[in-house]
Protein backbone atom coordinates (compact mmCIF):
# COMPACT_ATOMS: atom_id res chain seq x y z
CA UNK A 1 0.00 0.00 0.00
CA UNK A 2 1.42 3.42 -0.94
CA UNK A 3 1.53 6.20 1.64
CA UNK A 4 -1.02 8.15 -0.43
CA UNK A 5 -3.77 5.58 0.22
CA UNK A 6 -6.82 6.88 2.07
CA UNK A 7 -8.56 5.25 5.02
CA UNK A 8 -12.03 3.91 4.20
CA UNK A 9 -13.65 6.32 6.70
CA UNK A 10 -11.79 9.22 5.09
CA UNK A 11 -13.06 8.22 1.66
CA UNK A 12 -16.64 7.98 2.95
CA UNK A 13 -16.62 11.44 4.53
CA UNK A 14 -14.47 13.61 2.25
CA UNK A 15 -17.46 14.78 0.16
CA UNK A 16 -19.19 16.05 3.31
CA UNK A 17 -15.99 17.81 4.43
CA UNK A 18 -15.67 19.45 1.02
CA UNK A 19 -19.26 20.68 1.15
CA UNK A 20 -18.90 22.10 4.67
CA UNK A 21 -15.66 23.89 3.76
CA UNK A 22 -17.26 25.47 0.70
CA UNK A 23 -20.40 26.49 2.57
CA UNK A 24 -18.34 28.17 5.29
CA UNK A 25 -16.21 29.98 2.69
CA UNK A 26 -19.35 31.57 1.31
CA UNK A 27 -21.07 32.44 -1.96
CA UNK A 28 -17.95 32.52 -4.14
CA UNK A 29 -16.90 28.97 -3.26
CA UNK A 30 -20.46 27.66 -3.70
CA UNK A 31 -20.81 29.28 -7.13
CA UNK A 32 -17.39 27.97 -8.16
CA UNK A 33 -18.64 24.51 -7.20
CA UNK A 34 -20.95 24.69 -10.22
CA UNK A 35 -23.26 21.73 -10.74
CA UNK A 36 -21.93 20.13 -7.54
CA UNK A 37 -24.23 22.46 -5.61
CA UNK A 38 -26.56 23.86 -8.30
CA UNK A 39 -27.75 21.40 -10.98
CA UNK A 40 -28.02 22.79 -14.51
CA UNK A 41 -31.59 22.86 -15.81
CA UNK A 42 -32.41 20.75 -18.85
CA UNK A 43 -31.85 22.59 -22.13
CA UNK A 44 -29.97 25.43 -20.45
CA UNK A 45 -26.89 26.72 -22.29
CA UNK A 46 -23.59 27.46 -20.54
CA UNK A 47 -24.23 31.22 -20.65
CA UNK A 48 -27.75 30.82 -19.30
CA UNK A 49 -26.47 28.58 -16.51
CA UNK A 50 -23.81 31.14 -15.50
CA UNK A 51 -26.49 33.83 -15.29
CA UNK A 52 -28.78 31.42 -13.41
CA UNK A 53 -26.00 30.73 -10.92
CA UNK A 54 -25.07 34.39 -10.39
CA UNK A 55 -28.66 35.42 -9.71
CA UNK A 56 -28.95 32.96 -6.81
CA UNK A 57 -28.53 34.35 -3.31
CA UNK A 58 -26.38 32.47 -0.81
CA UNK A 59 -27.53 33.12 2.75
CA UNK A 60 -24.69 31.76 4.89
CA UNK A 61 -26.53 30.54 7.98
CA UNK A 62 -23.84 27.90 8.60
CA UNK A 63 -21.00 30.40 9.06
CA UNK A 64 -23.19 32.60 11.26
CA UNK A 65 -24.10 29.63 13.41
CA UNK A 66 -20.47 28.55 13.70
CA UNK A 67 -19.29 32.02 14.68
CA UNK A 68 -22.07 32.27 17.24
CA UNK A 69 -21.25 28.91 18.86
CA UNK A 70 -17.51 29.63 18.99
CA UNK A 71 -18.27 33.02 20.49
CA UNK A 72 -20.48 31.45 23.15
CA UNK A 73 -17.72 29.08 24.24
CA UNK A 74 -14.96 31.70 24.18
CA UNK A 75 -16.90 34.61 25.64
CA UNK A 76 -14.60 33.94 28.60
CA UNK A 77 -10.93 33.03 28.28
CA UNK A 78 -9.97 29.38 28.91
CA UNK A 79 -8.41 28.64 32.28
CA UNK A 80 -4.96 27.05 31.88
CA UNK A 81 -3.69 25.31 35.01
CA UNK A 82 -0.03 24.28 34.90
CA UNK A 83 0.39 23.06 38.48
CA UNK A 84 4.05 22.39 39.26
CA UNK A 85 5.02 23.61 35.77
CA UNK A 86 3.81 27.20 36.30
CA UNK A 87 7.20 28.55 35.22
CA UNK A 88 6.39 27.37 31.66
CA UNK A 89 3.46 29.81 31.31
CA UNK A 90 5.44 32.47 29.36
CA UNK A 91 6.27 29.84 26.72
CA UNK A 92 2.55 29.33 26.05
CA UNK A 93 2.48 32.74 24.35
CA UNK A 94 4.37 31.29 21.35
CA UNK A 95 3.72 27.56 21.64
CA UNK A 96 2.49 26.68 18.12
CA UNK A 97 4.45 26.01 14.96
CA UNK A 98 3.51 29.51 13.76
CA UNK A 99 4.23 31.16 17.16
CA UNK A 100 0.62 31.66 18.26
CA UNK A 101 -0.49 31.63 21.92
CA UNK A 102 -2.20 28.58 23.40
CA UNK A 103 -5.56 30.39 23.68
CA UNK A 104 -5.58 31.06 19.92
CA UNK A 105 -4.63 27.42 19.31
CA UNK A 106 -7.48 26.21 21.55
CA UNK A 107 -9.98 28.45 19.76
CA UNK A 108 -8.89 27.07 16.38
CA UNK A 109 -9.28 23.51 17.65
CA UNK A 110 -12.82 24.16 18.92
CA UNK A 111 -13.78 25.88 15.65
CA UNK A 112 -12.66 22.82 13.66
CA UNK A 113 -14.55 20.48 16.00
CA UNK A 114 -17.73 22.51 15.56
CA UNK A 115 -17.37 22.84 11.79
CA UNK A 116 -15.82 19.60 10.55
CA UNK A 117 -16.31 17.35 13.57
CA UNK A 118 -12.65 16.34 13.33
CA UNK A 119 -9.21 17.89 13.86
CA UNK A 120 -5.84 16.60 14.99
CA UNK A 121 -2.98 18.15 16.94
CA UNK A 122 0.62 16.97 17.23
CA UNK A 123 3.20 17.90 19.83
CA UNK A 124 6.58 18.03 18.12
CA UNK A 125 10.00 19.63 18.50
CA UNK A 126 12.97 20.48 16.26
CA UNK A 127 15.20 17.49 15.54
CA UNK A 128 18.23 19.40 16.81
CA UNK A 129 16.54 20.23 20.11
CA UNK A 130 14.56 23.23 21.19
CA UNK A 131 11.14 24.02 22.60
CA UNK A 132 8.25 21.67 21.75
CA UNK A 133 5.30 23.14 19.86
CA UNK A 134 1.77 22.31 18.73
CA UNK A 135 0.81 21.68 15.10
CA UNK A 136 -2.81 21.50 13.92
CA UNK A 137 -4.02 19.06 11.25
CA UNK A 138 -7.43 19.49 9.63
CA UNK A 139 -9.75 16.57 8.94
CA UNK A 140 -8.59 16.52 5.31
CA UNK A 141 -4.94 16.24 6.41
CA UNK A 142 -5.41 13.04 8.47
CA UNK A 143 -5.44 10.68 5.51
CA UNK A 144 -4.85 7.24 7.00
CA UNK A 145 -4.45 5.43 10.31
CA UNK A 146 -4.33 1.99 11.85
CA UNK A 147 -5.84 1.01 15.20
CA UNK A 148 -4.67 -1.96 17.27
CA UNK A 149 -5.38 -3.34 20.72
CA UNK A 150 -2.39 -2.93 23.03
CA UNK A 151 -1.24 -5.26 25.82
CA UNK A 152 -3.58 -3.53 28.25
CA UNK A 153 -6.55 -4.32 26.01
CA UNK A 154 -7.09 -0.72 24.92
CA UNK A 155 -7.55 0.34 21.31
CA UNK A 156 -4.82 2.76 20.22
CA UNK A 157 -3.44 4.02 16.93
CA UNK A 158 -0.04 2.59 16.08
CA UNK A 159 0.21 4.37 12.73
CA UNK A 160 -1.07 7.76 11.52
CA UNK A 161 -0.41 9.39 8.14
CA UNK A 162 -0.63 13.18 7.89
CA UNK A 163 -0.62 15.16 4.66
CA UNK A 164 1.37 18.40 4.74
CA UNK A 165 2.22 21.11 2.24
CA UNK A 166 5.77 22.48 2.21
CA UNK A 167 6.85 25.68 0.47
CA UNK A 168 10.06 25.27 -1.55
CA UNK A 169 11.98 27.66 -3.76
CA UNK A 170 10.58 27.87 -7.27
CA UNK A 171 12.63 26.45 -10.15
CA UNK A 172 12.51 29.88 -11.76
CA UNK A 173 14.33 31.40 -8.80
CA UNK A 174 11.40 33.66 -7.96
CA UNK A 175 8.84 33.03 -5.25
CA UNK A 176 7.96 29.57 -3.97
CA UNK A 177 5.79 26.60 -4.90
CA UNK A 178 3.84 24.04 -2.90
CA UNK A 179 5.02 20.46 -2.47
CA UNK A 180 2.86 17.78 -0.85
CA UNK A 181 4.62 15.51 1.64
CA UNK A 182 3.37 12.88 4.07
CA UNK A 183 4.38 12.56 7.71
CA UNK A 184 4.07 9.05 9.13
CA UNK A 185 3.74 8.63 12.89
CA UNK A 186 4.12 5.07 14.14
CA UNK A 187 5.10 2.80 17.00
CA UNK A 188 8.20 0.69 16.38
CA UNK A 189 8.61 -3.01 17.17
CA UNK A 190 9.99 -1.95 20.55
CA UNK A 191 6.80 0.10 21.10
CA UNK A 192 8.58 3.45 21.00
CA UNK A 193 7.19 6.42 19.09
CA UNK A 194 8.90 7.41 15.83
CA UNK A 195 8.14 9.40 12.69
CA UNK A 196 9.44 9.89 9.17
CA UNK A 197 8.66 12.04 6.16
CA UNK A 198 7.71 10.70 2.75
CA UNK A 199 9.10 13.06 0.12
CA UNK A 200 7.91 13.24 -3.52
CA UNK A 201 10.19 11.85 -6.25
CA UNK A 202 9.66 11.64 -10.01
CA UNK A 203 9.58 8.15 -11.47
CA UNK A 204 10.88 7.18 -14.89
CA UNK A 205 7.40 7.33 -16.38
CA UNK A 206 7.16 10.95 -15.17
CA UNK A 207 4.71 10.10 -12.37
CA UNK A 208 5.22 11.18 -8.77
CA UNK A 209 6.06 8.63 -6.10
CA UNK A 210 7.10 9.00 -2.48
CA UNK A 211 10.31 7.92 -0.80
CA UNK A 212 10.75 7.72 3.00
CA UNK A 213 13.37 9.74 4.84
CA UNK A 214 15.35 8.57 7.85
CA UNK A 215 13.38 7.51 10.91
CA UNK A 216 13.41 10.01 13.78
CA UNK A 217 12.78 8.90 17.38
CA UNK A 218 11.83 11.98 19.44
CA UNK A 219 13.24 12.07 22.96
CA UNK A 220 11.65 13.69 26.02
CA UNK A 221 14.00 15.80 28.11
CA UNK A 222 15.19 13.65 31.02
CA UNK A 223 12.77 10.80 30.25
CA UNK A 224 13.89 9.20 26.98
CA UNK A 225 11.48 8.24 24.20
CA UNK A 226 7.69 7.96 24.17
CA UNK A 227 6.58 4.37 24.79
CA UNK A 228 3.23 2.89 23.87
CA UNK A 229 1.75 6.22 22.81
CA UNK A 230 2.07 8.99 20.26
CA UNK A 231 1.95 12.73 21.03
CA UNK A 232 -1.04 13.15 18.73
CA UNK A 233 -4.66 13.82 19.72
CA UNK A 234 -7.57 13.50 17.28
CA UNK A 235 -10.55 15.57 18.44
CA UNK A 236 -14.21 14.88 17.77
CA UNK A 237 -17.45 16.46 19.02
CA UNK A 238 -18.25 13.57 21.35
CA UNK A 239 -14.82 12.21 22.28
CA UNK A 240 -11.20 12.01 21.22
CA UNK A 241 -10.03 9.15 19.02
CA UNK A 242 -9.29 8.27 15.40
CA UNK A 243 -12.85 7.22 14.51
CA UNK A 244 -14.56 9.77 12.25
CA UNK A 245 -17.48 11.51 13.97
CA UNK A 246 -20.30 13.46 12.39
CA UNK A 247 -19.94 17.21 12.01
CA UNK A 248 -22.26 19.14 14.37
CA UNK A 249 -23.27 21.53 11.56
CA UNK A 250 -23.56 19.01 8.70
CA UNK A 251 -27.37 19.17 8.66
CA UNK A 252 -27.31 22.97 8.60
CA UNK A 253 -24.78 22.98 5.75
CA UNK A 254 -26.94 20.60 3.70
CA UNK A 255 -29.98 22.83 4.23
CA UNK A 256 -27.83 25.82 3.30
CA UNK A 257 -27.07 24.26 -0.09
CA UNK A 258 -30.74 23.37 -0.60
CA UNK A 259 -31.67 26.96 0.27
CA UNK A 260 -29.19 28.16 -2.39
CA UNK A 261 -30.88 25.94 -4.98
CA UNK A 262 -34.36 27.20 -4.08
CA UNK A 263 -33.07 30.77 -4.19
CA UNK A 264 -31.71 30.17 -7.70
CA UNK A 265 -35.08 28.82 -8.86
CA UNK A 266 -36.89 31.78 -7.30
CA UNK A 267 -34.55 34.38 -8.83
CA UNK A 268 -34.75 32.60 -12.19
CA UNK A 269 -38.53 32.79 -12.11
CA UNK A 270 -38.52 36.41 -10.99
CA UNK A 271 -36.13 37.33 -13.81
CA UNK A 272 -38.51 36.03 -16.46
CA UNK A 273 -41.77 37.12 -14.86
CA UNK A 274 -41.04 40.48 -13.23
CA UNK A 275 -40.70 42.34 -16.56
CA UNK A 276 -43.90 42.49 -18.67
CA UNK A 277 -43.87 41.54 -22.36
CA UNK A 278 -45.36 43.99 -24.88
CA UNK A 279 -47.12 42.62 -27.95
CA UNK A 280 -48.74 44.07 -31.06
CA UNK A 281 -50.38 42.59 -34.19
CA UNK A 282 -48.65 44.11 -37.24
CA UNK A 283 -50.67 45.49 -40.18
CA UNK A 284 -51.56 43.27 -43.14
CA UNK A 285 -49.35 45.27 -45.48
CA UNK A 286 -46.48 42.92 -44.84
CA UNK A 287 -44.34 45.58 -43.25
CA UNK A 288 -43.25 44.95 -39.66
CA UNK A 289 -42.99 48.29 -37.87
CA UNK A 290 -40.74 48.98 -34.90
CA UNK A 291 -42.46 49.89 -31.65
CA UNK A 292 -40.63 51.92 -28.99
CA UNK A 293 -41.55 51.43 -25.34
CA UNK A 294 -41.66 54.43 -23.02
CA UNK A 295 -43.95 56.82 -21.12
CA UNK A 296 -43.93 59.37 -23.97
CA UNK A 297 -44.61 56.87 -26.74
CA UNK A 298 -48.03 56.14 -28.26
CA UNK A 299 -48.69 53.12 -30.47
CA UNK A 300 -51.16 53.64 -33.32
CA UNK A 301 -52.61 50.32 -34.45
CA UNK A 302 -55.03 49.90 -37.34
CA UNK A 303 -58.31 48.14 -36.68
CA UNK A 304 -58.98 45.26 -36.21
CA UNK A 305 -55.39 44.78 -35.03
CA UNK A 306 -54.60 45.30 -31.38
CA UNK A 307 -51.76 45.43 -28.82
CA UNK A 308 -51.30 44.74 -25.13
CA UNK A 309 -49.08 43.67 -22.24
CA UNK A 310 -48.43 40.14 -21.02
CA UNK A 311 -47.85 39.91 -17.26
CA UNK A 312 -47.25 36.90 -15.04
CA UNK A 313 -50.07 35.86 -12.74
CA UNK A 314 -49.99 32.77 -10.54
CA UNK A 315 -48.89 31.20 -7.27
CA UNK A 316 -45.71 29.42 -8.40
CA UNK A 317 -43.25 32.01 -7.11
CA UNK A 318 -45.04 32.24 -3.79
CA UNK A 319 -44.44 28.55 -3.24
CA UNK A 320 -40.71 29.06 -3.84
CA UNK A 321 -40.66 32.03 -1.45
CA UNK A 322 -42.41 29.90 1.16
CA UNK A 323 -39.92 27.07 0.61
CA UNK A 324 -36.99 29.44 1.23
CA UNK A 325 -38.60 30.69 4.45
CA UNK A 326 -39.23 27.13 5.63
CA UNK A 327 -35.58 26.21 5.04
CA UNK A 328 -34.43 29.25 7.01
CA UNK A 329 -36.68 28.21 9.91
CA UNK A 330 -35.36 24.65 9.74
CA UNK A 331 -31.78 25.94 9.90
CA UNK A 332 -32.81 28.03 12.90
CA UNK A 333 -34.27 24.96 14.57
CA UNK A 334 -31.03 23.03 14.03
CA UNK A 335 -28.98 25.63 15.84
CA UNK A 336 -28.73 28.64 13.57
CA UNK A 337 -30.59 30.89 16.00
CA UNK A 338 -28.99 33.98 14.48
CA UNK A 339 -31.06 33.32 11.34
CA UNK A 340 -34.39 32.93 13.11
CA UNK A 341 -37.09 35.58 12.89
CA UNK A 342 -37.39 36.76 16.50
CA UNK A 343 -40.42 39.01 16.08
CA UNK A 344 -42.68 36.63 18.04
CA UNK A 345 -40.29 35.80 20.89
CA UNK A 346 -41.21 38.74 23.15
CA UNK A 347 -44.13 36.87 24.71
CA UNK A 348 -42.27 33.60 24.97
CA UNK A 349 -41.87 32.35 28.53
CA UNK A 350 -38.45 31.63 29.98
CA UNK A 351 -39.39 27.94 30.31
CA UNK A 352 -40.20 27.70 26.60
CA UNK A 353 -37.02 29.55 25.66
CA UNK A 354 -35.02 27.20 27.86
CA UNK A 355 -36.63 24.16 26.23
CA UNK A 356 -35.83 25.53 22.75
CA UNK A 357 -32.14 25.93 23.56
CA UNK A 358 -31.71 22.83 25.72
CA UNK A 359 -30.72 20.54 22.82
CA UNK A 360 -28.14 22.97 21.49
CA UNK A 361 -26.72 23.59 24.97
CA UNK A 362 -26.41 19.85 25.56
CA UNK A 363 -24.42 19.52 22.33
CA UNK A 364 -22.18 22.42 23.32
CA UNK A 365 -21.51 20.85 26.71
CA UNK A 366 -20.48 17.58 25.06
CA UNK A 367 -18.20 19.43 22.63
CA UNK A 368 -16.64 21.43 25.46
CA UNK A 369 -16.05 18.23 27.45
CA UNK A 370 -14.38 16.55 24.47
CA UNK A 371 -12.24 19.59 23.66
CA UNK A 372 -11.22 20.01 27.30
CA UNK A 373 -10.09 16.40 27.59
CA UNK A 374 -8.05 16.56 24.40
CA UNK A 375 -6.47 19.94 25.16
CA UNK A 376 -5.58 18.77 28.66
CA UNK A 377 -3.90 15.63 27.29
CA UNK A 378 -1.97 17.73 24.74
CA UNK A 379 -0.84 20.22 27.36
CA UNK A 380 0.36 17.38 29.60
CA UNK A 381 2.43 15.97 26.73
CA UNK A 382 3.88 19.44 26.08
CA UNK A 383 4.78 19.84 29.77
CA UNK A 384 6.41 16.37 29.83
CA UNK A 385 8.40 17.23 26.71
CA UNK A 386 9.68 20.29 28.56
CA UNK A 387 11.00 17.99 31.29
CA UNK A 388 8.38 18.92 33.90
CA UNK A 389 5.82 16.97 35.90
CA UNK A 390 2.38 17.17 34.22
CA UNK A 391 0.56 16.54 37.51
CA UNK A 392 -2.45 18.85 38.02
CA UNK A 393 -2.12 20.25 34.48
CA UNK A 394 -5.57 21.04 33.12
CA UNK A 395 -7.43 23.15 30.55
CA UNK A 396 -10.89 24.45 31.48
CA UNK A 397 -13.17 25.96 28.86
CA UNK A 398 -16.09 28.26 29.56
CA UNK A 399 -19.48 26.63 30.14
CA UNK A 400 -21.36 29.84 30.82
CA UNK A 401 -22.70 30.26 27.29
CA UNK A 402 -25.20 33.04 28.03
CA UNK A 403 -24.45 36.58 29.18
CA UNK A 404 -25.91 36.64 32.69
CA UNK A 405 -24.19 39.41 34.60
CA UNK A 406 -24.94 39.86 38.30
CA UNK A 407 -27.70 42.35 39.06
CA UNK A 408 -26.86 45.53 40.96
CA UNK A 409 -29.06 44.57 43.93
CA UNK A 410 -27.36 41.20 44.23
CA UNK A 411 -23.96 42.87 44.15
CA UNK A 412 -24.98 45.24 46.99
CA UNK A 413 -26.03 42.30 49.16
CA UNK A 414 -22.82 40.43 48.34
CA UNK A 415 -20.68 43.47 49.09
CA UNK A 416 -22.46 44.06 52.40
CA UNK A 417 -21.95 40.43 53.43
CA UNK A 418 -18.25 40.67 52.56
CA UNK A 419 -17.82 43.94 54.48
CA UNK A 420 -19.47 42.40 57.55
CA UNK A 421 -17.17 39.38 57.38
CA UNK A 422 -19.93 36.90 56.55
CA UNK A 423 -18.07 35.63 53.47
CA UNK A 424 -14.33 35.34 52.92
CA UNK A 425 -12.25 37.03 50.22
CA UNK A 426 -12.04 33.93 48.04
CA UNK A 427 -15.82 33.49 47.90
CA UNK A 428 -16.35 37.22 47.33
CA UNK A 429 -13.95 37.65 44.42
CA UNK A 430 -14.84 34.37 42.78
CA UNK A 431 -18.54 35.26 42.91
CA UNK A 432 -17.75 38.63 41.34
CA UNK A 433 -15.77 36.87 38.63
CA UNK A 434 -18.49 34.33 37.87
CA UNK A 435 -21.11 37.10 37.95
CA UNK A 436 -19.10 39.07 35.37
CA UNK A 437 -18.61 42.05 37.67
CA UNK A 438 -14.85 42.03 37.04
CA UNK A 439 -13.27 43.07 33.71
CA UNK A 440 -13.68 40.55 30.87
CA UNK A 441 -9.90 40.36 30.54
CA UNK A 442 -9.57 38.89 34.03
CA UNK A 443 -8.73 35.21 34.39
CA UNK A 444 -9.01 32.82 37.32
CA UNK A 445 -5.34 33.51 38.02
CA UNK A 446 -6.06 37.25 38.29
CA UNK A 447 -8.77 36.49 40.82
CA UNK A 448 -6.30 34.43 42.85
CA UNK A 449 -3.89 37.36 42.81
CA UNK A 450 -6.63 39.63 44.18
CA UNK A 451 -7.21 37.20 47.02
Q: Whereabouts are the PLM-identified features?
A:
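Extended, helix-rich architectural segments
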Residues: 1-137, 141
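Hydrophobic alpha-helical segments and helix-packing faces
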Residues: 28-41, 45, 50-53, 58-61, ...
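Generic amphipathic alpha-helical segments used as scaffolds and interaction surfaces in large
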Residues: 93-101, 108-112, 239-246, 250-253, ...
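Extended, regular secondary-structure scaffolds
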Residues: 114-237
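Residues in well-ordered beta-strands of folded domains
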Residues: 122, 161-163, 311, 396-398, ...
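Extended, charged amphipathic alpha-helical segments
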Residues: 211-351
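C-terminal helix-loop subdomains that flank or include functional centers
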Residues: 287, 295, 300, 319, ...
Amino acid sequence: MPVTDLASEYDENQDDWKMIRDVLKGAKAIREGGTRYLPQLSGMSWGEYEAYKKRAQFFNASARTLNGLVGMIFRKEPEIILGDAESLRPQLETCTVDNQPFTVFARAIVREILSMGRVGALVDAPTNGGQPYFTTYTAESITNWRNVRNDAGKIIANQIVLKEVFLVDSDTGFGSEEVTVYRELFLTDSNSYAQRLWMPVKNRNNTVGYQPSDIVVPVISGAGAFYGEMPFICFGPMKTGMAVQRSPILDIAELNVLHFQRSAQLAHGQFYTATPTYWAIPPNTGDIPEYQVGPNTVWLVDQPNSCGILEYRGEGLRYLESACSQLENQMAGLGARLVADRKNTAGESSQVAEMRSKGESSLLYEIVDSAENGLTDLLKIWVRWNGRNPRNVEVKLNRDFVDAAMEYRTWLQLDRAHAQGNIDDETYYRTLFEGEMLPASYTHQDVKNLI
